[in-house]
């Protein structure tokens, strides 16, 4: 069976590598488009939803088409066999559109929905119910330029980044799928120390700890869309007993306290410090890996504050870092200038995150 996963555009190769480790056969990475197509079995769906840390959702592909006009959407969807939907089940279309088109995502959803209803009625004499709020079956219709993919969402309306462990809400939390991707890009493993010097509520450290201890993302979540479609056994897993050297630093006391609550809830031992990321050498003699998401996207009037933070952070990091530093930021020019001054830039990649064109830097 062919599936596709969605991820942050720019991190497709990271998601693909993880999917390979889960036993999938990669068919295509749509670089810059946030899609990875792969082969897997229906029986793999629970495992993929439980252990895909770098993907947003897992979708079972029903069809892939070239679409130029809105009428093409109706024709494409109507050509699909929807016999897997039971007559008593409801459905909803979730449409997404990227590129230049003479129609909207709402138009796609309307045409696709009508096509599903018409095809099912022709085949079975039953008009399927539409339920936009709590559908039994979610059909994804994603149009990227002229590439139209239709699939059954096995994850649900809540994407996989909804880990449900955030018992403390930071005002600007990092998406956990991106956090996991950054950890993977760093090459960190539990044998080494890891520091996030601007940790917020600790997402990067929690994700690193869950990877090291083999804690699945489904530990804190039960509602997956596939459970209304397939009767599949839950994946078996065993938590690893590993020693971790995880350190988080945060400027504000309330965030430190919140991060500690989350770490305790998940069961990840993290040492949190209230401190200044511009003075890392005052807190640490050496750190193997640094992975962080520093502040960015602030008003022009505050660029001076950002430049001071980035310059002093990277300078102090250069005094304690043993291996690699990975950071994501929308402040590309400032980050690049000081990264080149204090490190060697091993990689810079564009990543779309939260509507911002960001860069991920890998430094040594």
State where each predicted segment sits.
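Non-catalytic nucleic-acid substrate-recognition regions in nucleic-acid-modifying enzymes
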Residues: 1-135
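Class I S-adenosyl-L-methionine-dependent methyltransferase catalytic core
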Residues: 1-25, 29-36, 40-44, 79, ...
């Amino acid at each position: 069976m062919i599936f596709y996963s969605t991820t942050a555009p720019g991190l497709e190769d990271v998601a693909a590598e993880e999917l390979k480790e889960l036993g999938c056969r990669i068919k295509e990475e749509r670089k810059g488009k946030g899609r990875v197509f792969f082969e897997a079995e229906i029986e793999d769906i629970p495992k993929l939803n439980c252990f895909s840390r770098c993907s947003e959702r897992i979708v079972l592909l029903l069809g892939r088409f070239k679409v130029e006009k809105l009428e093409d959407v109706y024709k494409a969807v109507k050509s699909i066999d929807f016999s897997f939907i039971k007559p008593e089940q409801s459905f909803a279309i979730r449409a997404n559109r990227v590129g230049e088109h003479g129609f909207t995502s709402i138009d796609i959803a309307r045409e696709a929905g009508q096509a599903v209803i018409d095809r099912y009625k022709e085949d079975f004499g039953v008009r399927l119910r539409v339920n936009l709020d709590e559908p039994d079956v979610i059909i994804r219709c994603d149009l990227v330029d002229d590439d139209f993919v239709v699939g059954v969402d096995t994850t649900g309306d809540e994407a996989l980044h909804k880990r449900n462990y955030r018992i403390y809400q930071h005002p600007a939390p990092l998406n956990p799928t991106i956090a996991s991707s950054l950890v993977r890009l760093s090459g960190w493993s539990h044998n080494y120390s890891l520091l996030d010097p601007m940790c917020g509520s600790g997402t990067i450290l929690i994700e690193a700890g869950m990877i090291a201890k083999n804690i699945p993302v489904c530990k804190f979540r039960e509602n997956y869309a596939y459970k209304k479609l397939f009767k599949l056994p839950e994946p078996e897993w065993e938590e690893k007993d590993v020693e971790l050297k995880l350190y988080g630093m945060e400027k504000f006391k309330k965030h430190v306290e919140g991060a500690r609550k989350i770490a305790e809830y998940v069961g990840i031992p993290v040492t949190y410090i209230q401190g200044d990321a511009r003075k890392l050498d005052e807190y640490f003699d050496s750190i193997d890996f640094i992975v962080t998401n520093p502040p960015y996207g602030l008003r022009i009037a505050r660029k001076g504050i950002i430049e001071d933070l980035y310059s002093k952070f990277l300078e102090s990091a250069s005094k304690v870092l043993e291996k690699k530093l990975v950071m994501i930021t929308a402040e590309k020019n400032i980050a690049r200038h000081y990264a080149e001054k204090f490190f060697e830039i091993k990689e810079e990649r564009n990543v779309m995150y939260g509507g911002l064109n960001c860069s991920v830097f890998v430094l040594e």
